[in-house]
C-alpha cells in the first residue's frame, strides 16, 4: 500500500472506495494498534457515512479470519452459520438461535458464531449461557461438538482476542461501525453456506457481495419486513441470494408459504428470563404459533442454503415437522453436554 493514512481518510471522506489491499492494511493497522484512537474513530465514521463496499468488507474479514487460527483441524463437514448483524431494535426473541438448533435437528451441521448483546438487549450468548451452555469451553472442545452434536457455538470474544484492544474505543463511540458488519463474516470455521440477517435494506447487497467474495457456496442475506434482521411474518421480506457464484434479488412472502401474517410485536422477547423461556418452549415444540412460524420460515432459508431442500415451502414444512417433534431441544442438550468441562 503506497497511500498514507491521511490520504486514505480523504478518499473515504470524498465517498471513494478502498481497494482490497488498502482495506486489509487498515484492518492490520487496527489489530497492531498502529493508529491513534482519533484516527481510528475518524476511519470508522468515514466508512459509516457512505455505503459499505463488498471489497472492503471481504478484505477486512480475511484479515480477521487470519488473526484467529483454528486450534485444531476443521472437520470435513459442510457447515452453515446463522449469524446476523443485529441492531434492528425490535426486541424480538432469539430467532436465529432457535433457527440454528432447528436446522441442526433437521440434519444440517451448524457452526453458529455469536456474542453477547452490544445494545442492552439479549444476545445469543446471553440466552444460551442462561440455559446452561458453557461459553468458555476449550476451543478444541467447541470444534469437536460439531461431530458430537451436529452443532456448536463459537463465542466470538474467545476466537477474536485481537479485537480486545478496540473494545474501549468502540464503546466510547457508542454507534454501530463496520465491526458490527464484520462479526457475521469472520466465523473462524469458515462455513460453506450462511443465512445472514441485516437491519437495514441498504446492507443487503454489500453483505451478499462480501459473502460472494469470501467464496461461500450458497447464502441468503435477508432484510425482514418491518426492519427485522431476519425474515418476518409481518409482510414480504427482501433477499439477496447467492447460488453458484451468482447473486440475485428475491422476495419471501410468508402468506405464499401458508403462514399467517403476524405483527412484529408477536415476536417480542423481553428480558433474559423471558427469552430463555421462549427459546426452550419453541425448541420443545411449544411456544406460540407466531414463534414457531417465524422459526420455521427462517429455518427454511438455512435448509435451502445447505442444499437440503429445493424450495422455501419444502423447508418450512420440514422445519415445522421438526419443531413438533421436540428434537431441536435434544440438540441443545447434546451441545450442552459436549461443551461441559471434562470432569465437570
Swiss-Prot record:
- What Gene Ontology terms describe what this protein does at the molecular function level? anthranilate phosphoribosyltransferase activity; magnesium ion binding
Residues holding 5-phospho-alpha-D-ribose 1-diphosphate: 84, 87-88, 92, 94-97, 112-120, 124
According to its UniProt record, this protein's enzyme class is transferase
What Enzyme Commission number(s) apply to this enzyme? 2.4.2.18
> Known catalysed reaction(s)?
N-(5-phospho-beta-D-ribosyl)anthranilate + diphosphate = 5-phospho-alpha-D-ribose 1-diphosphate + anthranilate
Protein's UniProt keywords contain Protein transport: no
Output the Gene Ontology cellular-component terms.
cytosol
What cofactors does this protein use? Mg(2+)
- InterPro entries linked: Anthranilate_Pribosyl_Tfrase, Glycosyl_Trfase_fam3, Glycosyl_Trfase_fam3_N_dom, Glycosyl_Trfase_fam3_N_dom_sf, Nuc_phospho_transferase
* Annotated binding of Mg(2+) 2, by residue: 229-230
Q: Which keywords belong to this entry?
A: Amino-acid biosynthesis, Aromatic amino acid biosynthesis, Glycosyltransferase, Magnesium, Metal-binding, Transferase, Tryptophan biosynthesis
- Identify the pathway: Amino-acid biosynthesis; L-tryptophan biosynthesis; L-tryptophan from chorismate: step 2/5
Q: Where does anthranilate 1 bind?
A: 84, 115
**Gene3D superfamilies reported for this sequence:** Nucleoside phosphorylase/phosphoribosyltransferase catalytic domain, Transferase, Pyrimidine Nucleoside Phosphorylase, Chain C
Residues that bind anthranilate 2: 170
Q: Any note on cofactor binding?
A: Binds 2 magnesium ions per monomer.
| Residue positions binding Mg(2+) 1 | 96, 230
Entry's NCBIfam families? trpD
Please explain the role this protein plays, according to its UniProt record.
Answer: Catalyzes the transfer of the phosphoribosyl group of 5-phosphorylribose-1-pyrophosphate (PRPP) to anthranilate to yield N-(5'-phosphoribosyl)-anthranilate (PRA).
UniProt similarity note? Belongs to the anthranilate phosphoribosyltransferase family.
Subunit structure, interactors included: Homodimer.
Q: Please give the name of this protein.
A: Anthranilate phosphoribosyltransferase
Give the source lineage, highest ranks first: Bacteria, Bacillati, Cyanobacteriota, Cyanophyceae, Synechococcales
Q: Which gene encodes it?
A: trpD
